[in-house]
Amino acid sequence: EPNPRLETVIRGVELCRAHNIDLILAVGGGSSIDCAKVVAGSVHYDGNPWDIVLDSSLVKDALPLGVILTLSATGSEMDPMAVITNTEANLKYGVGHPDFIPKFSILDPTFTYSVPVSQTAAGTADMMSHTFESYFTLNDGAFLINRLAEGILQTCIHYGPIAVKEPENYEARAN
């Protein structure tokens, strides 16, 4: 589901507990991965997972998380952040914890071939927007980081349209 919901996190926690799960494998894009991160951090917490979204210091013993990426966009496969929506409270918050960093991520460009054109374009725009956030954050003296961001943006501008026109172009999907 887009914008992973607290209700889905709660169902995931219940499933993990009921079946004594010891590793979570998230398959999909950023929303699936974000949901899995908060599930992993909530399984050994007795309260509501929303508490962890509000205060990540409550994560004490997260389950390990692996990722198979099928939609490139957010970078969630390599970072400690997650965004969860609480529909009851009409809130959408981000949370970060070192234990949310996946233990492994499988990024096979062929797994993205079936992504619809509209989502490929939106994913490219999402990558660019996240890169712009970093680029325009006040980081005096961050010369190297800014050059990396510029390289990412140039790559998106070059390969994004190719991936849209040729969904099974390995080079475009890999870059």
Locate the predicted segments by residue:
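Short acidic, glycine/serine/threonine-rich loops at helix termini
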Residues: 36-39, 76-82, 117-118
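Carboxylate- and glycine-rich phosphate/diphosphate-binding segment that chelates Mg2+/Mn2+
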Residues: 81-174
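Conserved acidic residues
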Residues: 22-24, 63, 103
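A gly/ser-rich beta-alpha-beta helix-loop segment of oxidoreductase catalytic cores
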Residues: 65-67, 71-90
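Short, acidic/small-residue loops that bind anionic groups at enzyme active sites
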Residues: 46-70, 99
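N-terminal small/polar loop signature for handling phosphorylated ligands or for N-terminal nucleophile
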Residues: 1-47, 57, 162-173
